[in-house]
Amino acid sequence: MANSITADEIREQFSQAMSAMYQQEVPQYGTLLELVADVNLAVLENNPQLHEKMVNADELARLNVERHGAIRVGTAQELATLRRMFAIMGMYPVSYYDLSQAGVPVHSTAFRPIDDASLARNPFRVFTSLLRLELIENEILRQKAAEILRQRDIFTPRCRQLLEEYEQQGGFNETQAQEFVQEALETFRWHQLATVDEETYRALHNEHRLIADVVCFPGCHINHLTPRTLDIDRVQSMMPECGIEPKILIEGPPRREVPILLRQTSFKALEETVLFAGQKQGTHTARFGEIEQRGVALTPKGRQLYDDLLRNAGTGQDNLTHQMHLQETFRTFPDSEFLMRQQGLAWFRYRLTPSGEAHRQAIHPGDDPQPLIERGWVVAQPITYEDFLPVSAAGIFQSNLGNETQTRSHGNASREAFEQALGCPVLDEFQLYQEAEERSKRRCGLL
């Protein structure tokens, strides 16, 4: 259609609008944004090499706009409609996460951009969980929850209309895009008015806090929004000075020279006033603030090594002990880009330098990149991990629901049922990283 606005532009508008809304709803999130911005600035000022590296890898521009949100929905129809909504923003479902392994009755995917240019512009992601009613053991309660969910519509009538218009037209003009962002935002807004009476809320809450959070409100409010930092240990140590109480442990791998995957911490969930049906006042605890530090994406081989080491490490009682123990355990995981490349543990994006461009005819498909890197013809840049760690996600959920030590089981994965609810298969994160690396090699003439 004429004058259509791009998915990247719509995603950018939406992520900015969501951040502004969440700042109003949860003022501590605004404090967190300021703290993260200060820490990132200090890290880049003290490390010119990192600054230059991030500029060259097109990573710097995205740093300050980078966010991920998390939401929870109750029905297959809600999930499928969200898939249509996020597609308009150029966000697609990547990976399947089974959080039942940590006693959380949901399974999830991450809606995110998948091509290089979109990720470089704004890598906004939304970790989206679907409640698994079949994991509610009490049959009467299970039926009641299903009935409550059947009666709500988390999308405004105009939002549904705009979804239809987009799919018929194949795009939005600027006016439609702006209206869509505002209507879509309503789905994620916090509502003080619960849709149930206090007795129903308590019954669902006693089954699992998260069930009450999903079932008892009119929308799928954001339960956290997460900025990206370059030094999560520093943010964690400074949070109390800003009047923010952090969770006990930083989730994920230890601090390293070459960060891998994802490290996360958060502050405790807020206790918020709610009004139950019948105007009875009460409180609900669900929404919190989170911070993340992202590293390089690992290959299946690297991920297997990570999972094995993490399993052996266990968890400590306090963050300092836990981090020291993790660093000791992870000594066997190579901590240099060269070794990780040589051992096939991580994904890299290859680029020709000006000197490499001048010698392009001397580079052939199948050449080993290492001699070309040493010659200064090629640079290898770590590909940022854009996804999530199921155990960390579950750990964040648990700690913010007031339980840091929930036992972890083998879970009860049901990817097929999730994809059926979603209306399409989820994309494979490993395949996306492999394709990104191969695209870069092809551009250099290495493939």
From Swiss-Prot:
Belongs to the 2-oxoadipate dioxygenase/decarboxylase family. InterPro entries: HGLS, YdcJ_bac-like. Its cofactor is Fe(2+). It is an enzyme of class 1 (oxidoreductase). This is 2-oxoadipate dioxygenase/decarboxylase. Its EC number is 1.13.11.93. Coiled coil: none annotated. Catalyzes the decarboxylation and hydroxylation of 2-oxoadipate (2OA) to form D-2-hydroxyglutarate (D-2-HGA). It comes from the Bacteria. One of its GO terms (molecular function) is dioxygenase activity. The record marks R72 as: Important for substrate specificity. 2-oxoadipate binds at H68, R72, H224, V391. Pfam families: HGLS. Fe(2+) binds at H68, H224, E290. Keywords: Dioxygenase, Iron, Metal-binding, Oxidoreductase. It catalyses: 2-oxoadipate + O2 = (R)-2-hydroxyglutarate + CO2. The gene is ydcJ.
